[in-house]
Amino acid sequence: GLLLDNSSSYGVWSSYSGGAAIWHIKDIHSSCYGYNDCVAQSPKLVDLEEANDGDLDNALSNGRTTHLFYSGNSATFDNSSTPNSKLYDNSFSGISATSISAAGDNMTLTISK
C-alpha cells in the first residue's frame, strides 16, 4: 500500500522546506523481531519513495528536501515515473498522485486509481 502525507516544515521536518512524502508500505505481515531483522527486510516494511533518487536506500544521505514531492522538484508519482507506484512484484498498481502543488502548510494533489 501507499501512504501520503504533507511533511510541512515542522517537527522532524523542520530543517526542510516541506513537500509530500510518499511511503510504500509492505502489505503482508512480516515477522521481524528485532531492529536489525526489520531493517534488513527486503522489500522494506516501510520505504520513503524518494522523489529525486535512491540515495537513502544506498545510505548516501540522511534525507533532504528533494526526497519529497512538490512542484518544481517532482510533481508526479505513477506507474511510469521514477520512482514509480508499481507493486513490489512490478505489476501496475494503477495508483497515481499528480499535479502535486508547491511545498507548504497546505498542499494539493490529484490521487487516482
Feature names for model-found ranges:
Residues 1-113:
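Non-catalytic C-terminal accessory/binding modules of secreted extracellular proteins
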